Amino acid sequence: MEKLTIRDIDLKGKRVIMRVDFNVPMKDGEITDDTRIVEALPTIKYAIENGAIVILLSHLGRPKGERKPEFSLLPVAKRLSELLGKEVTFIPELYGEIVNEKVKNAKEGDVILLENTRFDKGETKNDPELAKKWAELADIHVNDAFGTAHRAHASNVGIAQYIPSVAGFLMEKEIKFLSKATTNPEKPYVVVLGGAKVSDKIGVITNLLDKADKILIGGAMMFTFLKSLGYNVGSSLVEDDKLDLAKRILEQAKEKGTEIVLPVDTVCAQKIEAGVETKTIDIKDGLPEGWMGLDIGPKTVELFRNSISGAKTIVWNGPMGVFEIEDFSNGTKEVAIAIAEETSKGATTIIGGGDSAAAIAKFGLKDKVSHVSTGGGASLEFLEGKELPGIASIANKKKIEN
């Protein structure tokens, strides 16, 4: 179902309350990475240029319903002012007299940022009273926070009970690309999964078994699969309570004709730290006790590169190893390069949020793939085939069009 977007509505003179994702990393009151603010700019600018009064809502961190100065959005307001080249009015409140007054006196093109939504306990509880207070400030709600789309909160879901909600450009882009991975993906379709735990990716594997041609498994989760097949994995991280499940997934894949590609070698060490002695060991030979696999090995890199080659749709979620440490970063880097190469040949490539997004940025390949998702948990749930509350609450195309 297509969703209404900010393009579909007349904004002139309208008060627009916009849920953005300004949950940026901070250190000592300074923003260390403003990517999320930059990504919200196109929607904010569009609203300003089309004569709207813009009221922005965002959370930052997890203050758990308490006013904590280190979670204030004041530094965000300053950075946003610089990026927009115009003053952003910051109000250190969420509702009440001061907020009502400022909004009432605002002119077309003005931008107001309210304080951290999570300073009120009602935000994460999706409190209808809180949602109503925000809805009363505006004519229309714009949801541009994909990162919280898997949460039903007052600022993204509750508010849509009172005023119409439409998607911002970032939300629209996320839905468009992630839908390509879950609905009629162009074939061959290859899914690359990594990260530590099978349990985090069960939903994705199960949902994509029917759709993908190949699923490549790296990261620490590979050892649960390998152990389920009887291989000796030494002291590698294994979810022993998921061994039967891993075996079942491999059997299901066989039945469905989906190829699951498991690593054939691994880079091992006795400790997870830089500068330690490393060994590359073939999986068939088994890992000695005390040694753990911390990256895919060179033979696996080659195997994965060949599997990725020629794909028309690629989804990648989760690193191949402990990529933050140089000695264990090669697998993740090589997979990132292989995916970038296929993108240049016309493949649609989608990188799940979180660690994979951090990895692709680290290796300077962010602009060499089709789409890097801004939401870790949200992109994972979308790929699991779940309906996300923050998307469900956005009006459908045919609903308010006339």
UniProtKB/Swiss-Prot annotation:
GO molecular function: ADP binding; ATP binding; phosphoglycerate kinase activity
Keywords recorded for this protein, A-Z: ATP-binding, Cytoplasm, Glycolysis, Kinase, Nucleotide-binding, Transferase
UniProt catalytic activity: (2R)-3-phosphoglycerate + ATP = (2R)-3-phospho-glyceroyl phosphate + ADP
A GO biological-process term: glycolytic process
Pathway it works in: Carbohydrate degradation; glycolysis; pyruvate from D-glyceraldehyde 3-phosphate: step 2/5
Binding, ATP: 201, 293, 324, 353-356
Assembly information from the UniProt record: Monomer.
Protein name: Phosphoglycerate kinase
Species name: Thermosipho africanus (strain TCF52B)
Gene designation: pgk
